[in-house]
Structure formats: C-alpha cells, structure tokens
Regions:
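Transmembrane alpha-helices
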Residues: 128, 132, 165-198, 230-233, ...
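Transmembrane-helix boundary motif in ABC transporter permease subunits
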Residues: 72-100
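Generic hydrophobic transmembrane alpha-helix motif, especially the helices
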Residues: 101-137, 145
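Hydrophobic alpha-helical transmembrane segments of polytopic membrane proteins
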Residues: 208-246
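Short cytoplasmic-facing helical segments at TM-TM junctions of multi-pass membrane proteins
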Residues: 141-180
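Transmembrane alpha-helical segments of polytopic membrane transport and secretion proteins
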Residues: 1-22, 240-259
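Membrane-embedded alpha-helices of multi-pass transport/permease systems
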Residues: 78-83, 125-154, 185-194, 241-242
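Periplasmic/extracellular loop-to-transmembrane helix junction in inner-membrane transport proteins
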Residues: 7-10, 33-75
C-alpha cells in the first residue's frame, strides 16, 4: 500500500512509469470503444478513414507539404527571434523590440492581403504567415528569458574581461541556449495549431490543414479524427526530435533536470 501511495504524492521518487503509462493507455482505449457517444467514431472507423485518406486523398503527401512549411517557418521564426533577442540587450533597440511583441494580437485575416503582395506564390505566403504568427509569440517568451538574466551574471562576465556583444553571446546566447530550445520546441507545437488556419486561407496550395478543412466542411467525422490523430502523432515525434537535438547540443540539461 505504501508503494502505491507514493504514486499520488507530489515529487515522491518512484520506479519506472512505463507500465503505468501502458495501463492508462489501455484503459483509455477500452473507454473509447465502449463510449455511448455515437458522434465520436471508434478506433476501427478511424483506421478505415485513415486508409481511405492515405490511398485516395493523398494525405501523406499533404502531410509532407505541411511538414516542409512548418520546418521552414520554425527556422525563420527562430532565426528572427534569436537575432532580435541579441539586439534587445542593447538599450537602443529595447523599445522597438518590446513593441513588436504586441503584434501577437493581430489576426491573420487582417494581414493576409499585405503578405500576399510581399510574397511570390502560395507556398511562400503560407510560410511567412506562419513565421509571423510564431515569431510574435516566440519573441514574447524569449524576452522574458533575457530579462531573467541577473546582474550578478553580467558582472561575472565583466570580471572575466567580457564586454559588449561578447558578454551577450556568453551570458544570453550560450547561457540560455537550453531555454531557447525549449521555447522553439513549444513554438513548433503552436505552429501546428496555426497551420489549419493558414492552409485554409491558402487552400489552393494544399497541405494537411487544407484537407482537414475540406473534411470539416462535409462533417466527415471519421476523416477529421483520422487527420487530427495523424497530426498529433507527427507532432509528438517532432517534439521528441527537437528535445533530442536540445539534449545533444546542451548535454548539461540532463544533469540539472529533476527526474
């Protein structure tokens, strides 16, 4: 009984959680199968819809298109945000960069026209709309990380003979790299939530978001669930991949994280 009690006590050390996770997954699947809500398709119906989408609707091709779009937007948003974050450490740039974080309140419907004029085709339009949305949120959190740098850290860098942009590189870029990777990983998930909206606006370019909008238009619930679960699985794999990259570049994270 004592060992079971430890599983519901916060921060209590326990053994492996793999068996517990498998058990919970099995329970959820059973509840899903016996659910009385007929509006929610069961797993077998979703599997049949997934096969139909993959063989007749080109879902895997559309997923690849969306993956390229997301990857491009993540790269551009991360590069822009990191560049602005470095500039933010200089007082002259702080007001304008702080103001840029307010752009996260703008909706895509009101700015699509301008991005249409600035881009050459639908693929570029999707990438830059996503980049805009992701950058606004990523920048807000990145500035919070930079503001968390203490005066003691800055003074310590100065005692080592570092000043100006070199101090910024050591204290902010290298010193907060693991936190920046976590932000990018979280922002990548935000990108998938924005994707359907963007691909719905630029539907002629395709993508899994456009396919989802088409299925939603016809209230094809089996297909909707199949697409959503496909995005969910892909997003989880993407999250693990980004976390793995972070652990490779910042191996000290594993030593400082609570298990």
């Amino acid at each position: 009984v004592g060992s079971l009690k430890s599983y519901v006590v916060p921060f209590e050390p326990v053994g492996s959680l793999k068996i517990l996770a498998i058990g919970q997954a099995i329970i959820l699947l059973v509840l899903w199968f016996i659910s009385p809500y007929k509006l929610i398709p069961n797993p077998l119906e979703i599997l049949q819809a997934w096969e139909m989408l993959a063989t007749t609707q080109g879902m895997l091709v559309e997923l690849w298109k969306s993956s390229v779009t997301i990857a491009s937007a993540i790269f551009y948003a991360s590069a822009i945000t990191l560049g602005l974050g470095v500039l933010y450490t200089a007082p002259a740039f702080k007001p304008i960069i702080r103001w840029m974080t307010s752009l996260r309140f703008l909706g895509f419907a009101g700015i699509t026209f301008f991005f249409t004029l600035w881009t050459s085709d639908g693929a570029a339009l999707k990438i830059w709309l996503l980049t805009f949305g992701m950058t606004a949120f990523l920048l807000t959190n990145m500035l919070a990380i930079i503001d968390s740098v203490t005066q003691e850290e800055i003074d310590y860098a100065k005692t080592l003979g570092l000043s100006g942009w070199r101090a910024t590189f050591e204290v902010v870029v290298r010193g907060r790299m693991d936190e920046a990777f976590d932000l990018i990983r979280q922002n990548a998930a935000i990108g998938w939530t924005l994707l359907s909206m963007v691909e719905g606006l630029v539907r002629y370019e395709g993508g899994i978001g456009a396919l989802l909008m088409n299925m939603s238009k016809h209230l094809n619930l089996d297909a909707i669930f199949a697409i959503q679960l496909t995005i969910l699985v892909y997003g989880i794999l993407q999250d693990y991949a980004l976390r793995w990259i972070r652990n490779i570049i910042c191996p000290y994270v594993a030593l400082t994280s609570a298990r």
